[in-house]
Design a protein with these regions (language model features):
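Conserved catalytic core of two-metal-ion nucleotidyltransferases
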Residues: 99-142
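A generic, well-ordered mixed alpha/beta core segment in the N-terminal half of proteins
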Residues: 83, 87-99
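Short gly/ser-rich loop at a beta-strand->alpha-helix junction or flexible surface loop bordering the NTP-binding
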Residues: 53-61
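Short, surface-exposed, charged loop/turn segments at secondary-structure junctions
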Residues: 159-165
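Catalytic metal-binding acidic patch
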Residues: 59, 67-88
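N-terminal regions immediately upstream of nucleotidyltransferase
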Residues: 1-36
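Conserved small/polar residues in nucleotide/adenosyl-binding loops
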Residues: 169-170
Length: 171
């Protein structure tokens, strides 16, 4: 599942996870693929220091850090009441570089929040497409949101290893 350039093939890894899961897991392939992308994005954010000003929360946090069985779509964060967008300069390119590094056939588009956006939440929209993907299927899309709200009891928790095969491909 590792390419000649040292990247891993997340689609092959997801297929292996679904196959190992047994009958009835076939419909979950896109969900498992998205969860592997979540791991990759969170790893890149941690390596670049973006978690110093953010608290991971929401459904994906419950699944990846607290063991919830429910799959979730998006990545949600609390940035605090004094959240400053400047602390996240470079987040889009960090995500794009990390996901593009998964192979030559991976195309990543990150839509950044509008600089003049009002409100409490800033949203990045991440679209991932692979060359082998059928044109009639949509890209994997992940929304990353940062809300200007406090996190009342933040805890440092590692992401759980939902798929032991992933341990073979960590850098």
């Amino acid at each position: 599942m590792t390419g000649a350039d040292g990247t891993y093939d997340y689609k092959a890894m997801a297929a292996g996870i679904v196959l190992a899961g047994g009958e009835g897991m076939g419909n979950l392939l896109p969900v498992v693929e998205k969860e592997l992308l979540h791991y990759r994005i969170l790893d890149a954010m941690m390596r670049e220091g973006f978690f110093s000003s953010l608290v991971f929360q929401g459904g994906t946090s419950l699944r990846l850090c607290h063991g919830s069985p429910r799959y979730s779509e998006d990545l949600d964060f609390a940035g605090g009441t004094s959240f400053d967008m400047d602390t996240l300069k470079g987040l889009g390119s960090c995500i794009s570089d990390s996901l593009s590094g998964m192979g030559d056939d991976v195309t990543v588009r990150v839509k950044e929040p509008r600089p003049d956006a009002d409100g409490l939440t800033r949203r990045w929209r991440i679209a991932i497409r692979t060359a082998g993907q059928r044109k009639d299927l949509p890209s994997q899309t992940i929304k990353l949101e940062v809300a200007s709200i406090p996190a009342y009891e933040p805890q440092h928790r590692p992401a759980l290893v939902n798929y032991p095969i992933c341990l073979l491909y960590t850098s």
